[in-house]
Amino acid sequence: MIVLGIESTCDETAAALVEDGRHLLSNVISTSVKEQALYGGVVPEIASRRHCEFISATVKKALLDTGKTMDDVDAVAVTFAPGLIGAVLVGVNFAKGLAYSANKPLVPVHHLRGHIAALYLTHPELKPPFLCLVASGGHSHIVEVQDYTHYHILGHTVDDAAGEAFDKVARTLGLPYPGGPSVAAAAKTGDPKAYRLPVPHVEGKYNVSFSGLKTAVLNEVNKAQMKGEAVNVPDLAASFQERIAGILAEKLLLAAADTGAKQVCLAGGVAANGRLRQLVNDGAQKLGAKVYLPELKFCGDNGAMIAAQGYYQYIAGHTAGLELNGLPTLPIDYE
């Protein structure tokens, strides 16, 4: 079964073809990230306009790259939540029109479920149940994946998401957007023990908080400026990365130990962070759990993950009609 996946929740316009939820046929991404970088972050209006400009050609290329047409496609999957609502609606409305005109089933896909499904593309042998940390620009969740369409949230951020914290700290340090790769690059030459950044304490055993950590970085920059000194950017970047990666890994591994999970996974944009991957891999080995990490090209937003999850949503009977609407927020464990 071939599913066309369409993704447009933020600044990536993406489309892909995936067969049987595991086999990648094509994967095309058009991005406005360079334009967004001029403003230090995503401007929703610009993102929406670029989606309108890019989406038709992006979907067409995903088909052309495989030599297939809509006659070969069995279903059209699209991210319908959560995300920047203007951006989401571009993808939803395009997918509705395409599915209707081609007489194909329309499959709504939750963005975070898509990030988790990216693991199936990298690891075709992976099957639920497993434990997954989904960390991206807008979300940080520790999730029990019970089967392909049922999820249980164990922990979440109580304020800023991990990816958002990376972006804001990068801006504070004068590093370019997107913040995750910029902070990681700067941290390579820094000392992770140079700055003693706080470990936030929050209610909920597996919950995380990053607003205080973000503020602590800002305070270090302000202190240096008041003394007429230049902050050591590599050291502060390394210290921040060490702290945030340590918090995320610790919470995930704690949940794995408590639940007895034998499969531990990372997903989402922050899953590309090398230090986080190392900490989770090392910690899971001590627990006797197998670690599954997504291929780097599947960490960020892409259409392949939506097509992969769309396959499982479809065989579970989750389809929609032309009444499908986009939503800015929706929990991953919605029914």
Question: PLM ranges: what are they?
Answer:
Residues 2, 8-9, 16, 26, ...:
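A short helix-loop
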Residues 108-109, 281-306:
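Conserved phosphate-binding/catalytic loops in two-lobed NTP-binding clefts
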Residues 69, 185-264, 273-287, 314-317, ...:
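A contiguous, well-structured pocket-lining segment that forms one wall/lid of small-molecule binding clefts
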Residues 78-104, 121, 274-283:
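Short Gly/Thr/Asp-enriched flexible loops that form oxyanion-binding sites at enzyme active sites
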Residues 2-82, 111, 115:
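N-terminal beta-alpha supersecondary unit
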Residues 109-131, 309:
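Conserved phosphate-binding catalytic cores of ATP/NTP-utilizing and phosphoryl-transfer enzymes
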Residues 70-80, 259-270, 292-295:
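Short glycine-rich phosphate-binding loop at a beta-alpha junction
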Residues 115, 294-333:
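Glycine-rich phosphate-binding/hydrolytic loop that grips phosphoryl groups
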